[in-house]
């Protein structure tokens, strides 16, 4: 079921295995009868939904679904200055407090004494803060950080040092202070692992291009995510998000926790697939468009959701809606039993938002974190005939690395170096099919008129 080129998959797996063998990172793991709960912590501006494929891979290797928990931070974006309140943003302390509360819930629900924490990017900041400053050294057995900017996205004295991403700022300097005579940067007795790219993580670059400071040295290298005292894994060519969501990153995490390689990184199919999730919006208040267009993970009550099976070749709807529902106060929808492997279209309509059409590949397995966001049309797009976005939430698009087509041609405006996770086109003419292809995965949808308030997203799963 892996929707990724065979050549690249084998290269990533071989690289991860080789690096892990050299690092000697096979830790003493639990028995199959006592697999620990895993709490997944998403990155900046992201959602629990990004952990969907990772959870599937753990389940495919025998991990109980009820012992896999992905948190969903209500306001997932960091503050520009961590010391100053900012509407719709979460401070490092608030982030840590939310994680602590979620860990407590998981411990109570499972009866376990400790959890494994697995975080991507900013999620690793919260994990480190919780273990060092929030009592997590007593409740966490393993901490796995993918692409976390542990020494900053930049480390420029005097430059935005109030940000939690500043390597010279008080937040990261406090976390990185030596913990023992050896100078370890990690807090014991927790076992730590970091996963990074060799040079393809946009937030671990020596030049300030991605922070709007092209030509300025960041004083950060590709090794920035590593921590002294941790097992540090390097996987060639993966991007910032793939440090957590790629099959190779999963394999590294599984072996670190259990002491043995996973039986498979492919996702096992279920005979009966049931999906559910949450519908969210944008801004400080998703019901008030005037409060901003930035991401949140707050429920969007009153939104109308329709789900359709679609034709794999054309993206056209196949028959009547599988689900037509009004979202309740908690934002939750489902569970909905869907045809295993059948591609789907999700259509969300809500006041103040565009009617958002999301086309996705078929679901091989059940998931309760199929979260959906109602988007808004950008001012620059309001006169377009239609607006279609190819998006890859669990990784970036890299024309120097990946095989991609968007509406039959390579995506326009996507730079080499895994710096973008989406591409947009504005097709003219009547309704028609549009396809997005990425390393073997193909998602097909239909155009819808932007003038009538519609947006289309072709969302890649892998």
Predicted region positions:
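Bacterial N-terminal signal peptides that target proteins for export
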Residues: 2-14
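Helical cap/lid subdomain of alpha/beta-hydrolase-fold lipid enzymes
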Residues: 47-49, 83-88, 92-113, 125, ...
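C-terminal motif of bacterial Sec signal peptides marking the signal peptidase cleavage site
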Residues: 21-24
